[in-house]
Amino acid sequence: MAVDITLLFRASVKTVKTRNKALGVAVGGGADGSRDELFRRSPRPKGDFSSRAREVISHIGKLRDFLLEHRKEYINAYSHTMSDYGRMTDTERDQIDQDAQIFIRTCSEAIHQLRTEAHKEIHSQQVKEHRTAVLDFVDDYLKRVCKLYSEQRAIRVKRVVDKKRLSKLEPEPHTKRKDSTSEKAPQNASQDSEGKPAAEELPEKPLAESQPELGTWGDGKGEDELSPEEIQMFEQENQRLIGEMNSLFDEVRQIEGKVVEISRLQEIFTEKVLQQETEIDSIHQLVVGATENIKEGNEDIREAIKNNAGFRVWILFFLVMCSFSLLFLDWYDS
């Protein structure tokens, strides 16, 4: 005879709900809540490799954003003509260069350390391939940021060279001539002011006394005029200065080309260094694998030597027993 235990089941469910409420456990209000309770899983633990890789990518992204944010101020060689707001000095640019190089070197060392630790840890082949792909992506991201920095630095150096070239080509201001003219003007004004009262007080001054003054003025005018020898000397000096400026201009152009070439070679050198670092890591892994293979080969050789020694003992034992058997049979037959 079947027994109806529906009331007992409802009482049990009510007891479980009351206990869960007392313990502070969330209870689903229906099918969805029960499904959430059944299929709820603990969060997947994140490994140290993922967090460190994200940290390196975040640092590289910050460096890229910083370079792009200060790109205009960094490559502007004429910042002294701007206002104080947004102006960047050469010392700040040098500090940016130094910090960027240290930052790139630190990120490269961090990638190398992550690659070494990833190869040392024991994981499945799929995990190893995944980590290798992640490190290759981070390495490529760092190379692109290095290329951006190298281009900015090359542009800055080129503009600095252009600025120096233009500053050398500017004519020198004739300050001495202006000073001499400015000094002569007050003297002439003072002489005129003193000459007028004298002329008014002595209107009947003889003409002979005024002739020396005219003679001195005429002599001064003659001194201002240049002789043909002086004109020729100044022309030769101008030709010499023009030749020097042309030679300086050619030297500046050569230096500019060399600086651009050095920047390009530096970019290639950075890429080659990163490639060599990857090749060194692969060679290290091959050396480690070869060492393990050599150890396994030595163990196999030792085991083979032991097996050969035991085999020789059994052969000797068999030969000795055969010899004794033949001697026994010969004795027994006789």
UniProtKB/Swiss-Prot annotation:
GO terms for biological process: endoplasmic reticulum membrane organization; intracellular protein transport; positive regulation of ER to Golgi vesicle-mediated transport; positive regulation of organelle assembly; regulation of Golgi organization; vesicle-mediated transport. It is found in: Endoplasmic reticulum membrane; Golgi apparatus membrane. Residues 330-334 are lumenal. Keywords: Coiled coil, Endoplasmic reticulum, ER-Golgi transport, Golgi apparatus, Membrane, Protein transport, Transmembrane, Transmembrane helix, Transport. Residues 29-50, 166-225 are annotated as: Disordered. Residues 183-192 have a biased composition (Polar residues). Residues 1-308 are cytoplasmic. SUPFAM superfamilies: SNARE fusion complex (SSF58038). Disulfide bonds: none annotated. Residues 33-50, 166-182, 193-207 have a biased composition (Basic and acidic residues). The keyword RNA-binding does not apply. Gene3D superfamilies: 1.20.5.110. Residues 242-304 form the t-SNARE coiled-coil homology domain. PROSITE patterns: SYNTAXIN (PS00914). Pfam families: Syntaxin-18_N. Component of a SNARE complex consisting of STX18, USE1L, BNIP1/SEC20L, and SEC22B. RINT1/TIP20L and ZW10 are associated with the complex through interaction with BNIP1/SEC20L. Interacts directly with USE1L and BNIP1/SEC20L. Syntaxin that may be involved in targeting and fusion of Golgi-derived retrograde transport vesicles with the ER. Belongs to the syntaxin family. This is Syntaxin-18. It comes from Mus musculus (Mouse). The lineage of its organism: Eukaryota, Metazoa, Chordata, Craniata, Vertebrata. The gene is Stx18.
